[in-house]
Curated annotation (Swiss-Prot):
UniProt gene name: cep76
One GO location term (cellular component): cytoplasm
Stored SUPFAM superfamilies: Cysteine proteinases
GO biological process: regulation of centriole replication
Designated name of the protein: Centrosomal protein of 76 kDa
Function: Centrosomal protein involved in regulation of centriole duplication. Required to limit centriole duplication to once per cell cycle by preventing centriole reduplication.
Protein's organism: Danio rerio (Zebrafish)
InterPro entries, A to Z: CEP76, CEP76-C2, CEP76_C, CEP76_N, CEPT76/DRC7_peptidase-like_dom, Papain-like_cys_pep_sf
Lineage: Eukaryota, Metazoa, Chordata, Craniata, Vertebrata
Amino acid sequence: MSLSPEKANELKQIIHDHLIKMDIHGKIRDVLTETVQGDGHHKQCLLSEEDFMHALQRRGIVNDVMKDLHFTNMYNSHTEADSVNKSATHFMDQNITQLKTANIGQLKRQLYLQVVGGKAFLEQLQEPEPLPGQVCSTFTLHVHFRNQRFRSKPIPCACEPDIQEGFLLEIHRDGPGDASKMADATTMLSICDPVHMVLIKTDTSGDTTLVSSYFLDWRTVLSAPNGKISVSAELLGVGAEAKVPAGVLNLKLELYPPLTETLSPDVVTMQKSLERQKTAEKERLFLVYAKQWWQEFLDIRPSNKSKLVKIFAQDENGVNRPVCSYVRVLRAGRLLESPRQAARFVSLLAQERAPVVGGGVRQEQWASMMVFLCRNKGDCEDHATLLCSLLLGFGLDAYVCVGTKVKNIPHTWVMTCGTDGSITFWESFTAHRYLHRPIDPDAPSMILQPKPVHPYQTLGCVFNHKIFLANCQVSDAVERCVFDFTDGSRWKAMSEEAVRSVCDPGFNTSLPPTPPLCSSSLVPNEASNQLELEMRYLLSEHRKDLGLATVWDDHLSYLLSAALSAYELERCAGVSYGNEEFQDAVRRAVPDGHTFKAFPINFLHCNARRAFATCLRSPFCEEIVCCRGDHVRLAVRVRVFGYPESACAVWIMFACKYRSVL
């Protein structure tokens, strides 16, 4: 039986609620404990997944689940008109899938992280109570641990949110050939990777807000007598509210299979203390070096003090970190096929400056990569560091540039150096690429100098995950810069060893772990069809309010697909194709004496009402939507292109053909 995504998600939700209600986690835990303890030869023979499933069946757990699970006739309760009237935000809130699943392997140690509710989210007291049936704001918890990512289902925002989720995290070894071996207590104690928990709030319009970014040190469970421990994680706010409590999550940690010998609490505490001391000493030494390096940079030329040389930046938790630590070599696997497609993906993540209370200068906040991906929006620094990380993953010599753009506005972008000496600038907000052509200040005045086509004015420094270089040329104007990084008279470099000591995860255990990219949860064809139905409904209702009838031309709508596909390919690859075929097809579809008009527009979201309201602000689109004349035929086509991390490029084209009435 094939179900639509909405019905499938509704079915999953019913099953999930039923399992929570009957405390399936507790029953499975009891059966596992009884099976392990009751097996007389468990020390010589490890419990397999098949044995455990047989144990569940023998104790009737599976039968109990199926016996108490009842389904009502939910499939006939929604009509097509109802689905058209729903907002796109409502559909997106339901379209939640677990990003990564794991099975209990007989040779792998697992950490079961269970969230059993929250409390003291006092800011939610200011939120009005939603009306029955009204879409409300939701919390979503994202979890990252050692290259594994999960997210919870959306939970209605409340002072005491009912977050009931379990995440099975695999504790694997790093060494080659060791991944299949069971990690013992000593090995796990040396694994200092925290569990990164990011709490996101999504409002009724689909806008996301970062509530908290929390790093959980899970190793306290290694000293628990029975391999179980309950903890309360106090979440703090972000940015200016980094020291203000945002709420508390109640957590349960449990190891599978349990340890035969637990560690002493003093041993775990001592290990954490030694790691903190080691990290603090490295950071102190780097700070001393950075101060000395900065003074040497100022001694070269007093005017260097005014250049934008960014050595440290604050993250969402108010922690000062070297800027090089925000860049990683990030490989996207099969999710992105080329550097230009990576640039397109980054440009689809929305722009948003860090929120600030009150007026004044711009609040600068560099988000860790996990936070940026979960929130799906950020400032120029977040976009630039992510794009640089992806370009490094594709094997390019990429750097983040810190400087200014037009009107002397501070800005961050990306630069790549070709093997032939060419320099290319990448604008992470738009995915535009600019070839750098420097101006020769010593050239005779009669020689025509190249005019810059990029929007960048000055450049203070460049960096990636290994290298930090400050611009010590006489002028920091971008068009005059010579990018010969081996020339010490033009670029002052930091010691690569010093940078590595605080920016390499292998040397500094306090750095946030680098998350993998996750595939899109969107089904492009279904999302396109749904959004197109909603746009047709909104356009028809708008014309009805104006006293105009609406007659659709389905063939003309279909022809618009070719243009939308070409637009997205041009954004990705920088080349256009198929325009001649599209124009020829339109000419054949429009009779003599008729006029054809079309209006394409690009969005980063699937909210039909927001998109339609934006389109009506354009006089060209309004002219098409409100078209009057003889034999008026309307067409609308929607194409949704899915990208990693739920990013999407939504292309909408409105068109009409009519015979003018003079």
